[in-house]
Structure formats: structure tokens, C-alpha cells
Amino acid sequence: MLQLAEYVAETLDIGPGTRVFEVDCGRGEFLFPLHQNGYIVGGIDGDADAIKDAIAAMPGGLFQVGMASALDPAVPWDVIVCRSLAAAPSNDYIRGLVARMYAKATHAIALIDVPDAQHQPLVHAITEAGAQAIQIEGAHIFARV
């Protein structure tokens, strides 16, 4: 996960002190290397045990139990990451989630490991949310706010 975290940080030109929030963060495997390097991390996941593990592994991280569909855009973070779009139930769900992610982000969003079939709906959803700078690198989609 270290290489992926470094790749995302480099692609988005972010460094220590940046606030990175992950949707469906699980135990925080993606966020852990960022936390170790001085990033402020947080996330949301529906699995309470996974969130307990994330809190134990990353003291000071801001984690909460909840579904991605309940993501609150009122609390801003610099970067919002999602690695779970392969499990998205529909394009409407994707559109709503991307809109909330984009509204929550102050710098960028990163959609990681996106299946090919979801590229077009995601790019459309990101454009609807207001992004004008979208970068696609293989299975990853980045959008600046």
C-alpha cells in the first residue's frame, strides 16, 4: 500500500500536513503510510471493527463508522480518496458519491482501481460536479477541485 499512497501523493502534489480522507477506508491500510509521514488522515467505513483498528493504528486520525452514501460534504478535507468503486451498486450511486466527494474536497479527489466499465460514468459524474481538470492514469482517476 506504501507505493500506492506515494503514487497518489506524488500525482496530486501533496505532502506532510495535507488532510487526506478515505471513503470506505476499512482498517486504514492506504492511509497508514501517509499517517506515518505526517499527513492528517481520516476516513469512513461501515465496519465498526475496521474503524476501531484504524483508530488504534493511527492515533489522532479522524475515523467514523458510516456508509459511503452518508459522506458529509460539510466537513472539508484537502483530498478525498475512494478505492471501493468496483463494488458500487449503480451509476446513480456513483454520481451521488462523486458529487459528495467533490463537495468535501478542497484540493482534489482520487478514484483508485476503477474498473474500465466505470471510467465513462465517473468522468461524467466528475464533470457534473464541476471539475475541469481530470487526469486518467490506467485504473486511477484524479480530479482537481
What are the residue ranges of the model-derived segments?
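Conserved alpha-helix/loop element of class I SAM-dependent methyltransferases that forms part
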Residues: M1-P16
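A conserved beta-strand element that flanks and buttresses the S-adenosyl-L-methionine
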Residues: V81
